[in-house]
């Protein structure tokens, strides 16, 4: 299905195989732009969370079609589906029953190793880890489910704020102002309790 979506949205020429999953499914990465500022995005660490995968394909299809100036300022790597085996079985976990977003330290899985390797080689200025979220999560103290939630991950148990985390918070603030000018959307802030085994927290600590 992913291959077809990439072809249908004219992203094939930007896309290559980063590596393979436990069950030998290809993990695809697309490269866009030529700017100095580097951004790494990945989706579907949890195989049953496919919304953002489709959103990424739609976004970059439009950006490339319109030859957006954004691509002149940024160099972007996109992993659409880090956990293709979980996607195939509609499971949060990979084929070995491991939650990839708890494998940042152990790096016991081929999918985790591929993400770490790309991070180390590409050396991004920003990382964006995309997930789905169930409607049981509310936006703040309201009874409304969060339509979207943001997180600037912690890098220590004290939830300290360093320059890197401050930049992430500022970027989230700017996005919030752009997408919610009337302040009438249900936008949440995800729990920032520190867990070094999660990739966001691990990358933030580097």
Labelled PLM ranges:
Residues 16, 20, 85, 98, ...:
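Flexible, active-site-adjacent loop/turn segments at secondary-structure boundaries
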Residues 189-206:
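Active-site-adjacent mobile loop/cap segments within catalytic or ligand-binding domains
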Residues 1-26:
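Short glycine- and acidic-rich boundary segments immediately preceding or forming the N-terminal edge
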Residues 36-189, 193:
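Active-site/substrate-binding loop(s) of hydrolase catalytic cores
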Residues 31, 89-92, 201-205:
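Short glycine-biased active-site loop of nucleotidyltransferases that positions the nucleotide triphosphate
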Residues 8, 121-122, 205:
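Alpha-helix C-cap/termination motif
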Residues 28-36:
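Short beta-strand-to-loop junctions in surface cap/lid or active-site-entrance loops
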